[in-house]
Amino acid sequence: MQEFAIDTRLRVAAFLSQIGHESGQFRFMEELASGAAYDHRADLGNTNPEAIRIAAANGSTPGRFWKGHGPIQITGYLNHLAAMMALHVDCVEQPRLLCEPVHGCRAAGWFWSVNGLAKRADVGDIDGVSDLVNRGKKTAAIGDANGFAERKALYDRALKVIS
């Protein structure tokens, strides 16, 4: 976590709450859903001809091939590509590499860093952190991220434990 400056009580609590929720409290390093819902998501790069080619070469479709991986659930061709370029791990051709603890945790830290989540964590904005992880943007509504109640409970529990 030091590599990505997840190094204060508020940052650690926020980070753990998000990866705790996204991974089913560290039980699942690959999204449980099939990923088919992501097949036509241009915002994830899954309609890119190269994405379609790579997925097909692996007997899959883009949504299924690049469904959520790792404790923060890196999702989609473009996110796997960006993670690969940043971390030097070929999670484009081998997305399940992010299911391995070292690669997955580094990918989660990278995601945290590139999305500026420390800024929100530093002011205790667990709603903003949750929105950015789950929705990709801050929303006006409070608590509308998927699983917000669990994210908040995990955050509160982490704050009590971390001194």
Task: Name each model feature, range by range.
Residues M1-A5, A14, T61, C91-C99, ...:
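Second-shell loop/turn segments in exported
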Residues M1-G20, G24-Q25:
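Export/targeting segments at the very N-terminus of extracytoplasmic proteins
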Residues D7-R11, R64-K67, G124-I126:
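Extracellular/periplasmic catalytic domains that process cell-envelope and extracellular macromolecules
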Residues A13-L16, I72, R106, W110, ...:
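Solvent-exposed, polar/charged alpha-helical surfaces in well-ordered, non-transmembrane soluble domains
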Residues S17-F111:
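Peptidoglycan-targeting cell-wall enzymes and recognition modules
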Residues I19-E22, A121-G143:
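Acidic helix/loop microenvironments that form the catalytic cleft of cell-wall polysaccharide enzymes
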Residues H103-C105, V114-A121:
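Proteins synthesized as precursors that undergo proteolytic processing into mature forms
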Residues L132-S163:
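Low-complexity, Gly/Ser/Thr/Pro-rich intrinsically disordered linker/tail segments
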